[in-house]
């Protein structure tokens, strides 16, 4: 998908072309996210430093301050500042080591670096699609929507995590953030996460951290690192205790290997697999339980379904999926990036920065 762009391509069904035209999309190709290697063979405190050296640390610090100031309640900031050293003992490695290493490098407090990593967990509005084409190939795409696009678009990166010099898994993240909302284990599975807002987020999250529950994006990364196949990944993502509710979308490499997992903090609320033999060749997840109507003021779901049906199963590809994720309002003013991926073709993992000129 390195050549994917927002220009309509020959072969796309005419209805999808009309949807794209109605969205007023530019023909300019959105820029690809920068790609870096992070060696998991390095100690956690040092492994991100080669990446940080490519960035203006004042920009990174300003972005973190903006996110904390807007997304973290003052009582949480005060509380974490008092208990951060105790809380650190409850959090899993390598994440805490990586956070500590980056905040030392940037001369920031451990409390602030931990808070910004938690803040990114709390407000991620997204659209994820997993689908199977008529030949049995599995495709997975996602839009990540978030405020602060003026700075976060400059800090979005694709990271290849290396073990013994080989790519163990790939993910998309923001500089300073150790979790992954989007990722791929080559020739095994792909994962994306969408927020499931159930209220009282900070109160529940902090209490769960002290019970050794894991942040939702950290579990995606741990699953990419540890799970050997699609089935194992689904089991880990469905059952591991979390600090917040979430939707996990998983794609595999074989026919029917696609699922949306609706999570409560303590376990699965629903498992919604592909069922292509009965016509369900795709699943669309935004930020709402799939068995309930999407709210009229945020119905990205219906637009995505219409675009998928306009494309058709026989015409599905990573490029077509990118175009589907470019239909308004699936693609909107808050969209930071679009990633398309297929675990069976891991070299085609591609993230493109959306709205690059928007302030």
Curated annotation (Swiss-Prot):
Effect of residue 145 to A: Loss of autoproteolytic cleavage and loss of enzyme activity
Disulphide bond pairs: 103-113
Localization (cell): Lysosome; Membrane
Record's signal peptide: 1-28
The protein's annotated pathway: Lipid metabolism; fatty acid metabolism
Expression by tissue: Expressed in numerous tissues, with highest levels in liver and kidney, followed by pancreas.
Keywords assigned by UniProt, alphabetized: Autocatalytic cleavage, Disulfide bond, Fatty acid metabolism, Glycoprotein, Hydrolase, Lipid degradation, Lipid metabolism, Lysosome, Membrane, Signal, Zymogen
Impact reported for residue 126 to A: Loss of autoproteolytic cleavage and loss of enzyme activity
Catalytic activity from the UniProt record: an N-(long-chain fatty acyl)ethanolamine + H2O = a long-chain fatty acid + ethanolamine; N-hexadecanoylethanolamine + H2O = ethanolamine + hexadecanoate; N-dodecanoylethanolamine + H2O = dodecanoate + ethanolamine; N-tetradecanoylethanolamine + H2O = tetradecanoate + ethanolamine
Known EC number: 3.5.1.60, 3.5.1.23
Activity-pH dependence: Optimum pH is 4.5 with N-palmitoylethanolamine as substrate.
Chief location: other
Glycosylation site positions: 37, 107, 309, 333
Similarity field: Belongs to the acid ceramidase family.
Function as written in the Swiss-Prot or TrEMBL entry: Degrades bioactive fatty acid amides to their corresponding acids, with the following preference: N-palmitoylethanolamine > N-myristoylethanolamine > N-lauroylethanolamine = N-stearoylethanolamine > N-arachidonoylethanolamine > N-oleoylethanolamine. Also exhibits weak hydrolytic activity against the ceramides N-lauroylsphingosine and N-palmitoylsphingosine.
Name of the protein this chain belongs to: N-acylethanolamine-hydrolyzing acid amidase
Upper taxonomic lineage: Eukaryota, Metazoa, Chordata, Craniata, Vertebrata
Gene assigned in the entry: NAAA
């Amino acid at each position: 998908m390195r050549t994917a762009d927002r220009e309509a391509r020959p072969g796309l069904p005419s209805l999808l072309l009309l949807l794209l035209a109605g969205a007023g999309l530019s023909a300019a190709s959105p820029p690809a996210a920068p790609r870096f290697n992070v060696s998991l063979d390095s100690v956690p405190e040092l492994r991100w430093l080669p990446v940080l050296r490519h960035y203006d640390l004042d920009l990174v610090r300003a972005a973190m301050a903006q996110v904390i100031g807007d997304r973290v309640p003052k009582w949480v900031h005060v509380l974490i500042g008092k208990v951060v050293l105790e809380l650190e003992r409850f959090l899993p490695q390598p994440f805490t080591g990586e956070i500590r290493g980056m905040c030392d490098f940037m001369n920031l407090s451990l409390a602030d670096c931990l808070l910004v990593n938690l803040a990114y967990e709390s407000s991620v509005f997204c659209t994820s699609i997993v689908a199977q084409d008529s030949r049995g190939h599995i495709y997975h795409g996602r839009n990540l929507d978030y405020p602060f696009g003026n700075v976060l678009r400059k800090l979005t990166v694709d990271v290849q995590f290396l073990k013994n010099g080989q790519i163990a898994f790939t993910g998309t993240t923001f500089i300073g953030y150790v979790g992954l909302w989007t990722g791929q284990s080559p020739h095994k599975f792909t994962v994306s996460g969408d927020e499931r807002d159930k209220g009282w987020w900070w109160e529940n999250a902090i209490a769960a951290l002290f019970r050794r529950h894991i942040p939702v994006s950290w579990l995606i990364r741990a699953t990419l690192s540890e799970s050997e196949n699609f089935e194992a990944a689904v089991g880990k993502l469905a059952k591991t205790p979390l600090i917040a509710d979430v939707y996990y979308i998983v794609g595999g490499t074989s026919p029917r290997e696609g699922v949306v997992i609706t999570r409560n903090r303590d376990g699965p609320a629903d498992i919604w697999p592909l069922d292509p033999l009965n016509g369900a060749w795709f699943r669309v997840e935004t930020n709402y339980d799939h068995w309930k109507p999407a709210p009229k003021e945020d119905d990205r779901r219906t637009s995505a379904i219409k675009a998928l049906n306009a494309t058709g199963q026989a015409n599905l590809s990573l490029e077509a999926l990118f175009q589907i994720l470019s239909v308004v309002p699936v693609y909107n003013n808050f969209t930071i990036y679009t990633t398309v991926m297929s675990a069976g073709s891991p070299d085609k993992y591609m993230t493109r920065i959306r709205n690059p000129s928007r302030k």
